[in-house]
Amino acid sequence: MWSDPIADMLTRIRNANVVFKDQVDIPASNLKKEIAEILKREGFIKDYTYIEDGKQGIIRIQMKYKGTRRNRERVIHGIVRISKPGRRIYVDKEHLPKVKNGLGIAILTTSKGVITDKQAREIGVGGEVIAYIW
């Protein structure tokens, strides 16, 4: 059993990225599906699919790389969990983080759902900072 399923998801993605895996399987949850949707929309992963297995389900993430199979370059350069179960990090709308001076994204969970820092600025809401990705 994991004490932090989101950190487990991010670690699986990070490890698959390091060894240039084509896909990675993650135990599913609604929050993880929303995070995968943001990663797809922002161009960090190719796609994801939900696979029903009779239990909680599996999210299969198709990793994305630049270049040919021989000269691959990673699209995800860094992925970090910010708010942890032992120390939650919340920000208000005036203090929304900019990751790598706008080159990366912060994923937040807000009253409006799971969104990026850019969307939170547009809507004008704050929330819990889940992760930084660049």
UniProtKB/Swiss-Prot annotation:
Keywords, alphabetical: Ribonucleoprotein, Ribosomal protein, RNA-binding, rRNA-binding
Record-linked InterPro entries: Ribosomal_uS8, Ribosomal_uS8_CS, Ribosomal_uS8_sf
Coiled-coil ranges (or none): none
Gene3D superfamilies: 3.30.1370.30, 3.30.1490.10
Annotated GO biological process: translation
GO CC terms: ribonucleoprotein complex; ribosome
A Pfam family matched in the record: Ribosomal_S8
SUPFAM superfamilies: Ribosomal protein S8
A molecular-function term among this protein's GO annotations: structural constituent of ribosome
Family matches, as PANTHER family: 40S RIBOSOMAL PROTEIN S15A
HAMAP family given in the database record: Ribosomal_uS8_B
Family named by the database record: Belongs to the universal ribosomal protein uS8 family.
Role this protein plays: One of the primary rRNA binding proteins, it binds directly to 16S rRNA central domain where it helps coordinate assembly of the platform of the 30S subunit.
UniProt subunit comment: Part of the 30S ribosomal subunit. Contacts proteins S5 and S12.
Protein name per Swiss-Prot or TrEMBL: Small ribosomal subunit protein uS8
